[in-house]
């Protein structure tokens, strides 16, 4: 209560005046270093196809950065381009490259593959400790694991997201045979178990868990999550993993009139007390001013 901002009412958040002010700030913060041949602004009458590529193009976390509140709506770069382009311009998207390795995850989530106790989705137990100990004071059911909470948010029955752990369980029925990738993203961290074991894991900053599945077989899925403090999030996705192929990417966008690349750094690499340990980064701090090798 020492400063007037401490008594700001919730009704002020995202009010029309503030939204307009934030938009103007965003517009005036852009620095155009080069505009060769007057390319910008784009003329929708002359552009038939736009290719949007890069690891930051369709990533909500990249829009939020490191220290953030929770807007009611988040628009990624890809979504913004599609909105501005309208129906008259074709917009295609390829991730193309990852931040620091050559793995590319392609989401192909199928909610019909996950069920428990006769219900689609996951059972979940929450604990007010970081060790999954004792009797869970709050249990629930999620059709999908995809949560984002502010610091100290109550998830239910008095359990808050500070010094909290949770475990989701389900049975996964493989839709086909072959390699299936489960991507786990979490703040602070989460680990996936399949049939009681941690499966093969790939990726330097992304957690890609690999299952060599047999069509029709059922696998026990368990996701264990821990959150100590600050903002929290956890998400489970499924799809397939492939290696980046620059030549294939170039061929796939060769007919585009405009190519927009969204890459560089990311809050998935830089932050405070992170688990990232890769060349150029140590626990969220930079050890080099060079861009990642990719």
Cite the ranges covered by each PLM segment.
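Structural signature of the thiamine diphosphate
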Residues: 1-3
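C-terminal non-catalytic regions of proteins with extracellular/luminal or membrane-system context
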Residues: 6, 12-13, 20-294
């Amino acid at each position: 209560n020492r400063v007037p901002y401490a008594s700001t009412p919730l009704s002020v958040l995202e009010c029309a005046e503030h939204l307009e002010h934030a938009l103007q700030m965003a517009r005036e913060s852009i620095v155009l270093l080069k505009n060769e041949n007057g390319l910008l602004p784009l003329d929708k009458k002359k552009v038939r196809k736009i290719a949007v590529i890069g690891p930051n193009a369709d990533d909500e976390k990249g829009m939020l950065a490191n220290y953030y509140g929770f807007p009611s709506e988040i628009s990624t770069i890809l979504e913004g381009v599609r909105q501005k382009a309208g129906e008259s311009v074709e917009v295609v998207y390829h991730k193309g490259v990852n931040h620091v390795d050559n793995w590319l995850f392609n989401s192909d989530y199928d909610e019909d593959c996950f069920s428990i106790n006769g219900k689609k989705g996951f059972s979940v137990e929450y604990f007010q400790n970081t060790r999954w100990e004792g009797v869970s004071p709050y249990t629930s059911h999620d059709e999908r694991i995809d949560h984002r909470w502010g610091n100290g948010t109550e998830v239910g029955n008095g359990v808050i997201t500070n010094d909290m752990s949770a475990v989701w369980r389900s049975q996964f029925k493989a839709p086909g045979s072959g390699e299936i990738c489960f991507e786990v993203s979490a703040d602070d961290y989460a680990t996936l178990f399949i049939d009681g074991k941690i499966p093969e894991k790939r990726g330097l900053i992304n957690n890609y868990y690999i299952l060599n599945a047999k069509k029709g077989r059922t696998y026990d899925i368990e996701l264990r999550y821990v959150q100590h403090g600050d903002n929290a999030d956890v998400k489970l996705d499924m799809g397939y993993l492939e290696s980046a192929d620059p030549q294939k990417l170039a061929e796939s966008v060769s007919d585009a009139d405009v190519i927009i690349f969204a890459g560089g750094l990311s809050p998935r690499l830089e932050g405070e007390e992170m688990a990232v340990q890769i060349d150029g980064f140590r626990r969220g701090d930079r050890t080099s001013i060079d861009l990642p090798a990719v």
